[in-house]
């Protein structure tokens, strides 16, 4: 995602240009017995009140000011939050300061790291955005029983992968270069190394968290253990992670092998049959080093102008000889095109289509998305989905950039983790679906086109869920559209939901964190 110039924006409001609080200076109004109400307070007043309380170098950006457009830029523009002001903290303690002042004035606050929230629920927000883009420091902590690193809350995948790789380490991150680490981690966090090391959340050791009232606490298995449980799986509802300690691992694998296949539609059933065999028909036996395979349907003009192709790419943590032995069934199917190669781990995202500069990571469009999770591909359902896909984009060319993604990660270490140890739901689901109807801004602004895209998504989700009739619908919370039942995001176990709600009431009794797939 395009970054903005902090130096350019700093001219609007920085501590260097604001007086420090000291004896003889008028006390800010939030120390008054009767502070200003939300309706009385202008954005300019908020800036004047907040500025002196922040660290030197922190930045406040107002509407129309230098850097404003970049500061509020998001990956998904279907349902945007309404931002009154942007605060860019220079140190972690600035976050608690912002939260306390926002609470004092009754102004909602929302954290942005890389701006990849997909859920429509953030469209309900209007208030102050806390921008984590300057809090990206990574500090390696060698030690026993496991080596680890501290990551500030703004750390993101490509940055972390490259930093650790250059120093001889790897860790679990998401599979797209451009997303933050902790955002996905609060919902579990799938990634290419999860077969070896588990989800992002499985690797957490400590979190520094700012609570809804602005207090800062250390959270781990023994300090605030109930919050620790909830932050792993439902953390978006419970606090702001300003920094976190996570396990890292010695870099033992020099190169990853990738192999992409493009098939014509007549191979669809054979492809999904081979995938089910490859994944052990849902028994968790996916080869542990085949970190991720992902694919789906889209228009490839080099193959057909009118029929979507079936495209798949595999990423293997090891040499080509080992990977190709596993991929031989897919090569036998007679792809229309294929490509393979070997890259160091920092290059595998680009090789698999999820790199920083590739279309999947570019901001500015609207994304109407749905998701599902199950264990075995239903080829009949996938054929129905393909036919729906073909009919819909033929009738509505504005939807031609839509993609139906299917993600199959290795799950060995994920399966070994105790499901009762965290709030992560549906740990036993092996396959992760994601449909994205991508619209240009002009098309998204047309209510008729947007309505068609949403109906397209609802039909896709229904086909996927009906294709797994023995399972209750499951929603990966990080991919949720926001209209799904609560149980489908956080689990159907009544005791777990009750526990989550109790934690929510304890740590956020006034509902400050309610803009990301809220549990209450």
UniProtKB/Swiss-Prot annotation:
E.C. no: 1.-.-.-
Up-regulation conditions: Expression is increased in rice-extract medium (REM) and is correlated with the production of pyriculol.
Signal peptide segment: 1-23
Cited InterPro entries: BBE, FAD-bd_PCMH, FAD-bd_PCMH-like_sf, FAD-bd_PCMH_sub1, FAD-bd_PCMH_sub2, FAD-linked_Oxidoreductase, Oxid_FAD_bind_N
Keyword terms of this UniProt record: FAD, Flavoprotein, Glycoprotein, Oxidoreductase, Signal
Coiled coil feature spans: none
GO molecular function ontology, one term from the record: FAD binding
Cofactor(s) the record lists: FAD
Recorded metabolic or biological pathway in which this protein acts: Polyketide biosynthesis
Residues that carry a glycan: 77, 220, 378, 390
Membrane keyword on record: no
Function in brief: FAD-linked oxidoreductase; part of the gene cluster that mediates the biosynthesis of pyriculol and pyriculariol, two heptaketides that induce lesion formation upon application on rice leaves but are dispensable for pathogenicity. The highly reducing polyketide synthase synthesizes the heptaketide backbone of pyriculol and pyriculariol. Pyriculol and pyriculariol contain several hydroxyl moieties and double bonds, so it can be assumed that several reduction steps occur during biosynthesis.
Name recorded for this polypeptide: FAD-linked oxidoreductase OXR2
Name of the gene encoding the protein in the UniProt record: OXR2
